[in-house]
Curated annotation (Swiss-Prot):
It holds the Pfam family SecD_SecF_C. This is Protein translocase subunit SecD. Residues 104-117 have a biased composition (Polar residues). Residues 104-198, 540-570 are annotated as: Disordered.
Amino acid sequence: MFASGHTTPRLGIDLAGGTSITLRAVPEAGQESAINKTNMDTAVEIMNRRVNGLGVSEAEVQTQGDRNIIVYIPKGTNSKEARQQVGTTAKLYFRPVLATELSGANATGTPSASETGGASDKATDKATDKATDKATDGDKATDGDKASGTPSDSASASATSQGRAASDALKADPSPSATSSDGASPSPSASASGDDATAKLQQQYAALDCTDKNARAKAGDGAKPDEQTVACGQNSQGQWQKYILGAAAVDGTEVDEAEAVYNTQTAAGWTVTMKFTDKGSKKFADITGKLAQNQSPQNQFAIVLDNEVVSDPYVSQALTGGNAEISGSFDQEEAQSLANMLSYGALPLTFKEDSVTTVTAALGGEQLKAGLIAGAIGLALVVLYLLFYYRGLSFIAVCSLLVSAGLTYVIMALLGPTIGFALNLPAVCGAIVAIGITADSFIVYFERVRDEIREGRTLRPAVERAWPRARRTILVSDFVSFLAAAVLFIVTVGKVQGFAFTLGLTTLLDVVVVFLFTKPLLTLMARRKFFASGHKWSGLDPKALGAKPPLRRTRRPSRPAAGPVDPKEA
């Protein structure tokens, strides 16, 4: 806990306040009717799953009016990351790359449709059939070109050459095939297409400056999945590149599940692994098989998220495993955020951020203080009862309660940064209720030991013989409590989930403490004279418990065997 730097649990909105984000639904051209109750409810559900996946982060998402959604993020949460999670539409497409080059001030003066720059990546179909996106430098890009075929000639550094390269790329088949490679390769003698759409896209590509934030936001705006488009992306060196992309070959709805994992085998750091549906797997295998036969950069496919290229791996062979992996300069939070967006799906509407404000605590520190005081009073009453009834045994019970409380505090503090757990007032109530559950386990064990002593056994045998019976009772009792907490967690939403989560967590900790601390400690104390001799303040005095005297068996004298009787003399 101290090594991680998280020494206190995160508090929920009701206790510490947080941030309020107001999002406004914006209809696309000709789709004003898309803003309806069904789509708004779907958006709320997806946003809630993104920021509150386990239901314990205390984030709240609710509608306001016909087209506004308000998201409440508790204090201590990365508000910038949360804003990206809830506002990102997360429309994912896999598109073939037709042309790419460095953009704006990052350009080196040698743009061409065959230039891979610093964002050229490699997708290899290894044991797991993962398409691995590794941002590489120029040398590695060259090596990749050699691995996939003979590199094509680069066009000269001039506006005319740039236009020709882009024009030739647009002539390429959007769904590359084995024969499209030669036609797609840039040639100085190639002429611009006369098609209006092609010319317009060529102009957009030539004018696109990806170093401009506004230009990046508008790149590919309004393009349909089955149309060619332009887009921007950033490579591992932080340089912006612009792309001409073909029609989408696979879309995000074909992603069955996504997960953030730390790749230790290839030293790629945090990556996002995706598993496609059966239909998506077939599409992915088809497109990668076609791309593998092309020359760079048309052997690359771009993973496009909300019109921005997040990865552009190149392919050396068809990937048939139905899995893909996105890697790059991700940290854990970024990888988890992307995995959540891919897993929970795209928003049905586009949202614009209207306002971000700081909200105060709904209840404040006084309620938290009152809850802690109530917990302290409950704990004190339990301790007094133990002292009165169990006397010396209360030392073991109090030590066990302190260990359980310490473990609960540490785990709550660590769960904040790991799963976003936030402590609200219902969760505090769950921790208070857990005091009774923990004390109940001690009482069951102590009473079993006392029963054995009443039967006339000494303390050490009584401790060992009582444990199997007490263990079964404790496990059954804790299982029922945990089952109730699990059902409550599943069927409820909002703050009640915090109560159920805390109750279930402390129930599991009760089992750990009883098995690994209470029982070994009682076994150790049974060897001490104070307890073993049955001192009157030990709580295990045989006389006070009404113990039966130990049973003693006496041997009856054996009777002589019957034999012939000598006759008496007269």
